[in-house]
Swiss-Prot record:
GO terms for cellular component: extracellular region; membrane; other organism cell membrane. Disulfide bonds: none annotated. This is Eumenine mastoparan-EF. One of its GO terms (biological process) is defense response to bacterium. Its main location: secreted. The keyword Secreted applies. Linear cationic alpha-helical peptide with antimicrobial activities against both Gram-positive and Gram-negative strains and against the yeast C.albicans. Shows moderate mast cell degranulation and leishmanicidal activities. Has a very low hemolytic activity. Its mast cell degranulation activity may be related to the activation of G-protein coupled receptors in mast cells as well as interaction with other proteins located in cell endosomal membranes in the mast cells. It is found in: Secreted; Target cell membrane. The modification Leucine amide is found at L14.
Length: 14
């Protein structure tokens, strides 16, 4: 589970 990856994905989707 890549936490930073998820955060970056959410940040990129915003």
């Amino acid at each position: 589970f890549d936490v930073m990856g998820i955060i970056k994905k959410i940040a990129g989707a915003l």
